[in-house]
Amino acid sequence: MTHELFDSKGLLGSAPAAFVAGEYELDSSHGTLPVINPANGQLVAEVPSSSSSTVDRAVTAAVAAQREWGRRSHVARAAVLEAVRDAIAVHADELARIVSVEQGKPLSDARGETEGACAFFDFAISQKYRAVGSMMASEPGRSLGVREEPIGVVAAILPWNFPVAIFARKVAPALMAGNAVVLKPSELTPLSALALARLCRLAGVPDGLLSVVCGEGKDTGRALVTHPGVGMVTMTGSTRGGREILAQVADQIIPVSLELGGKAPFIVFEDADLDAAVEAAADARLWNTGQVCTCNEVTYVHADLHDEFVRRVVDRFASVTPLDPFAAGSRLGPLVAERERTRVQGMVDAAVAAGARVRTGGGRPDGEQYQSGAWFAPTVLTNVRPEMDIARREVFGPVLPIIPFDAEAEVVSAANSTAYGLTAYVYTRDLSRAMRMIDALEFGEVYVNQAGPEQVQGFHTGWKSSGLGGDDGPHGYEKYLRRKTVYVRHAV
């Protein structure tokens, strides 16, 4: 039976299909990808997996389309992106339904994600009057200039946690900079990208300039990032996946931008606003069911506040009821897939075996409605030690380990001991201490007395094993450009 998401008049059409060089690819001879609703475990669709020959057609078409697109003025490119942004706003409800079905987040959060996608397009559009470059006299009768140019074809690899927002985060600046994009969404959430590709075409994005190929990373992804026509790879995903991409493209020597995993410490000092810290710690852990690279992954609380903080956070977590993404008042959905639920359960079980104490949650919620689907109850763990696996590896689920500390130097050392370096949080009323922590923490983003999300004009970048390059703002936009130095002798 065809899922209700598929309609000849809708963004997905009557059947799921890759979007390649302006055409819809229905060929399933290379296999299919099952799309499962994580709330109930039911099959939503089977999406054709793209072969290496399909990837080749997409990149070849992108090379041709980029030549014309790159010659357009910034203002002309921005006009197309404005049409895409407006189309996303018009179709926000349909896009949100697709996200909720395939990814599992509450419908209200999915609607917020579409708003975030529009914001990414807004920032890219703002670059239409960008005036960056230089021309200067170098010697009498000679000048020297440095200017920006598009890279060419960008291969974009997307994760499953924000399939609409991160599509926009990659596509908008890449196109605005004059590039073409061939994009591979996660095999768990391909429908959002396919819907957006159709929407982009309707909004006037030229055929071939944007293609979406579907498949697993080891097949379709590898064929894409190693294609000789690709000039840059941008990827958001796991650290393991980032390492694989770096190895795959090493022979090509092309720019790579990676936004990878994180193990964000959330540090609460004795002088913190306790109400604000508790609320932010919970929100930063439970947003998107904990499936955010910037989520609060381990909370360090000063010993003077520890017991009261734990009591309040446990009450807060226990009050959150996981609900079907389409249910009224839903604020916490399932994990994205059963494999993720199993992985998170294994980490919690290992922590308990090592001495951690479950204060609330700990596994699948009670109730018949939770027996199908990838459900996991909001979980708080205490008696956690910094050397435990759950305090060092990314959980990516609604699990909050809490660790007490006594001294500033102690917590800095513990926070920095992870291999990751994406996001950190600090709660204190002491400005001098806050500035010391900003200096000491080895993370690309530091939030002081607030939680996320990040803003489009900032720079979302990780240190250490959390990535290379980054997204957003002028620094992220520049990743999609290369520079050419021009020497001119004009005196004869």
Curated annotation (Swiss-Prot):
A Gene Ontology molecular function term of the record: succinate-semialdehyde dehydrogenase (NAD+) activity
Active-site residue list: E259 (proton acceptor), C293 (nucleophile)
UniProt record similarity statement: Belongs to the aldehyde dehydrogenase family.
Protein name: 3,6-anhydro-alpha-L-galactose dehydrogenase
UniProt-listed PROSITE patterns: ALDEHYDE_DEHYDR_CYS (PS00070), ALDEHYDE_DEHYDR_GLU (PS00687)
Keywords attached to this entry: Carbohydrate metabolism, NADP, Oxidoreductase
Reactions catalysed according to its record: 3,6-anhydro-alpha-L-galactopyranose + NADP(+) + H2O = 3,6-anhydro-L-galactonate + NADPH + 2 H(+)
Organism, as annotated: Streptomyces coelicolor (strain ATCC BAA-471 / A3(2) / M145)
Claim: Oxidoreductase is one of the keywords in the record: yes
